[in-house]
């Protein structure tokens, strides 16, 4: 009887254990299945990472290659050439409006909005992540675990790491900025966005870039971008995509949030913190030397009194906008003295509590294989160059002891609506008229005069060579003053052409 009771008790306990363990096993299997569904689902996404993040800017089919216009005493030839620009930046500029979508560990979609620097955030329940900061001296204290990696929680964790460095290590470790520099002339919105990897609207709004005036050749603009990086914060890359998601999340949940072959998931792997300085150099000069003049100024070449670039600088202004760093430097600086811009760039280039860092760029990776998500920009643009020509004149002077005749001819250039050059031939009304010493006259030339031909001949009185050339010049350059002089005797004539 006792043995029977023991057997019954053991059987009851075994049955209870089976009933208790069954939900645990089922729950564990459910979690594993959900994780596997995420890993296999993301792994099975079919996309070309170069195509899914392709940015096709302007496509130019036709344009007028040349145009000529008169402006006062000048003739301006505008020459246009089609260019193509292809870039694949991996660090994407951060603007204020996307801070909460571009923090370390943030999940995004690789869609059109990402290409346009307006990333779509993938909002689902998350597992904890580790973030790391590269401030010197922290060593083993450079990492922190964030249980619920939202924008607010991650930002708070970064502040905690930075505060720790300021309290413990800032006195023994200096932190000069790592500077990245890029520059480009402005030709179009798509071109400058691709060249500097920045949203053109930022430049338009903060610097006041007038793209219409640039397109109409009314202004020439160069943009400088200085990225001064104080530190970088990175998120640990997952071994499997499911490592990032709460156990309750399934691949179907991700699909409902927008994950697809056309919009595969990404994670922000690192964010650079520091300050960005955008500088606009703008001029109303139409000189072909504008870019060279601006570059000389940037290099701090001593050219303030340069006659070569004087007109350009007198008609130029400079604007700087600082994002990050000391709040006193945030205001827009507009000046005609580039030394003030240099001061803005030089000041506050070291991280401190009074000169805090600001998120300036980020890099994302595809969850499928942790490969870097690079936006592939391709755009056409028109590069415009202008050449100014001024009016000139020919000063004829004859003091020789002989009868002389002159021939002066030139072409005046214009362009038709297709941009083709049209030449109108012109001649001086005094051509081949006998002139005796002393004779002088002035022949005015329009600024669009080309192919200038000057000939002078003397009457020798010799039957076998009645006329002898004293001057015979083709393609005489147009200058303010073309001084043509002839002198001497019939046997020993003299001549010169000088320019000033």
From Swiss-Prot:
Entry GO terms, CC: extracellular region; host cell plasma membrane; membrane
Motif residue range(s): Conserved undecapeptide: 458-468
MF GO annotations: cholesterol binding; toxin activity
GO BP, one annotated term: killing of cells of another organism
Key words, A-Z: Cytolysis, Hemolysis, Host cell membrane, Host membrane, Lipid-binding, Membrane, Secreted, Signal, Toxin, Transmembrane, Transmembrane beta strand, Virulence
Localization: Secreted; Host cell membrane
Transmembrane domains' residue ranges: 189-202, 209-218, 287-296, 304-316
Entry function: A cholesterol-dependent toxin that causes cytolysis by forming pores in cholesterol containing host membranes. After binding to target membranes, the protein assembles into a pre-pore complex. A conformation change leads to insertion in the host membrane and formation of an oligomeric pore complex. Cholesterol is required for binding to host cell membranes, membrane insertion and pore formation; cholesterol binding is mediated by a Thr-Leu pair in the C-terminus. Can be reversibly inactivated by oxidation.
Family that this chain belongs to: Belongs to the cholesterol-dependent cytolysin family.
Protein name: Perfringolysin O
Taxonomic lineage: Bacteria, Bacillati, Bacillota, Clostridia, Eubacteriales
